[in-house]
């Protein structure tokens, strides 16, 4: 991949270029900039912005790391403070319009609902962050549910939260599976289109 080939995937000012596994599906309207590392079978939806371009004191840009089979839906914004990183664990779903601002670390199989926001936060595995919830400078233990619209800023507020139910965990898995199938379907459609174009060139 080069910046000339893909205008939506490009270098930052430090010269870092995204590392994207070929099995990942990146919508053409998404913007992937700088020191971004996208692992296998990731889905990046329309109008998402993933931008790693803020240099730390050492002059380097810390990475935004998106692990295997993560779902990034439409309009998600991922960025970080100078020298800070964002890490998203495998099979996590980040829903429409969510904002992740590093430093933050998200574990495996989490569910970050629509319009939720994170800043300087850590989510262990299987955490549910509800619609429009805001989390700042806190750590959520595994299987915690943050209700829709909650604003969580300290440890006492975290400790007051309940754990997700089995029904909620099943829902998280269903949302991830549906979007994973969507990635597969779009890739198959792209491969068919490329095959048709290739055949047309040969015939021409």
Q: Which stretches of residues belong to each language-model region?
A:
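Core nucleotidyl-transferase/polymerase catalytic module
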Residues: 91
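Beta-solenoid repeat scaffold
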Residues: 38-40, 67-68
